[in-house]
Amino acid sequence: MTKRILMLEDGNYFIGDAIGSEKETIGEVVFNTGMTGYQETITDPSYYGQIITFTYPLVGNYGVNRDDFESINPAVKGVVVREAAEFASNWRNQITLNEFLKEKGIPGIAGIDTRKLTKLIRKEGTLKGILAAETADKEELLHHLRSVRLPVDQVHEVSSAKAFASPGDGKRVVLVDYGVKSSILRELNKRNCYVTVVPYNTSAEEILAMHPDGVMLSNGPGDPKDVPEALEMIRGIQGKLPLFGICLGHQLFALANGADTFKLKFGHRGANHPVKELATGRVDFTAQNHGYAVEKDSLIGTDLKVTHIELNDETVEGLAHKEYPAYTVQYHPEANPGPSDVNYLFDEFMEMMNGKEEGELHA
């Protein structure tokens, strides 16, 4: 089997077996601790520009099926696994992981010590990495890797180019696409919502002209400070319409209301993150995928209150506006992959939109 190298910007490197596409690639090396859900993870637009390390030792054993994709075209740069299953065993399987990676042009590496790599990332933080042929000159690879700047226009790359509708006969929801997962759209469709998905740079005036019952801010990749156009839109919407944000949408909501965000050392990526609701003490296990978080101290003096925290590091996991029907969460209530403990948040959004009809808005 052809050999491949994963070179990190700190000079560490790993040599293993090549899987997927043969092309060379550069990205931010991160790790995901989920035991299952690799195909949802690989097709999640929030992973744009990243090389994903799966900590679970065997990946690909149940294959890949197109029904569970979170986007049509995966945006990941590469995949790292301890062992890639050569044969898939599942009645829904349509294609093996290796075949899928080749089809989508995603290079990968297998047979390396993913535990060692994960511990390295935990210690040093996320690092740039390059996947290349094992025969490549290591010094040249390292020099090239260190000279490359990772893109900052990630949301622009994964957002819808134009608005489109997913019809229903219930509440009318505008879903702002910063890299939305298909599962979020499906959760709204389950509740009979008429959903209009709009590009990330849609203005408040354009959204209000659609006369929706509520607005959702989706997940997405990268640094929220790279999407300044979203902040004015959020300020123009909150108080006029019920607002619900997820992941990147949560961070943008915080920035729009005067708070700050920061980059986590190695992020939260997995399906077992415990989150505590401060009002009730309820603890849920959640799916998470983010490299940035809201700075808790920056919320002092704003109109936002913390509703949820992550129990491992006490980072902010939920916010609510003190005056308006607007709330956001850092985690993923739609799951896929991960537990569906917090799926009820979509029902709370529906209740907020019902409150709009009853005149409960403060605008």
UniProtKB/Swiss-Prot annotation:
Composed of two chains; the small (or glutamine) chain promotes the hydrolysis of glutamine to ammonia, which is used by the large (or ammonia) chain to synthesize carbamoyl phosphate. Tetramer of heterodimers (alpha,beta)4. It is an enzyme of class 6 (ligase). Pathway: Amino-acid biosynthesis; L-arginine biosynthesis; carbamoyl phosphate from bicarbonate: step 1/1; Pyrimidine metabolism; UMP biosynthesis via de novo pathway; (S)-dihydroorotate from bicarbonate: step 1/3. GO terms for biological process: 'de novo' pyrimidine nucleobase biosynthetic process; 'de novo' UMP biosynthetic process; glutamine metabolic process; L-arginine biosynthetic process. This is Carbamoyl phosphate synthase small chain. Residues 172-359 form the Glutamine amidotransferase type-1 domain. CDD domains: GATase1_CPSase. GO terms for molecular function: ATP binding; carbamoyl-phosphate synthase (glutamine-hydrolyzing) activity; glutaminase activity. The active site is at C247, H332, E334. InterPro entries: Anth_synth/Amidotransfase, CarbamoylP_synth_ssu, CarbamoylP_synth_ssu_N, CarbP_synth_ssu_N_sf, Class_I_gatase-like, CPSase_GATase1, GATASE. PANTHER family: CARBAMOYL-PHOSPHATE SYNTHASE SMALL CHAIN, MULTIFUNCTIONAL TRYPTOPHAN BIOSYNTHESIS PROTEIN-RELATED. It comes from Listeria monocytogenes serovar 1/2a (strain ATCC BAA-679 / EGD-e).
